[in-house]
UniProtKB/Swiss-Prot annotation:
Pfam families: RuvX (PF03652). This is Putative pre-16S rRNA nuclease. Keywords: Cytoplasm, Hydrolase, Nuclease, Ribosome biogenesis. Belongs to the YqgF nuclease family. Its EC number is 3.1.-.-. One of its GO terms (cellular component) is cytosol. One of its GO terms (biological process) is rRNA 5'-end processing. It comes from the Bacteria. Could be a nuclease involved in processing of the 5'-end of pre-16S rRNA.
Length: 143
């Protein structure tokens, strides 16, 4: 694995209908949206995940953890953790969970500020939320 500061990152914003994906470099501290993968009750097309991992070859995979505002966990936290464990178990990648409170809210704000569609049911923001998860992790590493 490369030295801290030089790692390739892939971030996932787990959801039951869609899973947002972003990539980035720790050195730059920024990410770019890659994809919004369809999911059926939180179960992705694992072949799509495998293809992304093969293409991007991340050193660390980040999975958003949607904690409550009082730091407690909820059902979605358990599902996101399970998704992270499956990523590690299937593909033997290093997985880190990242506090993602308010990332979807912030991503929706960015879309609306840019004049984008407010129909988030059809036009999700999950890939943008994954960017925010990645950037949050980078800021935490930088101290």
């Amino acid at each position: 694995m490369p030295d801290p500061g030089n790692r390739r990152l892939l971030a996932f914003d787990f959801g039951t209908r869609r899973i947002g994906v972003a990539s980035g470099q720790e050195m730059l501290g920024t990410g770019q949206p890659l994809a919004m993968l369809p999911a059926r009750d939180g179960i992705p097309d694992w072949q799509q995940i495998e293809a992304l991992l093969a293409d991007w070859q991340p050193d660390i995979v980040l999975v958003g953890l949607p904690l409550n505002m009082d730091d407690t966990e909820n059902e979605m936290c358990a599902r996101a953790r399970k998704f992270g464990k499956r990523l590690h178990g299937r593909y033997h990648v290093t997985v880190e969970m990242v506090d993602e409170r308010l990332t979807s809210y912030e991503a929706k704000g960015e879309v609306m500020a840019g004049g984008g569609s407010r129909d988030f049911g059809r036009h999700g923001v999950d890939d943008r939320a994954a960017v925010l998860i990645l950037e949050t992790w980078c800021r935490e590493q930088a101290g």
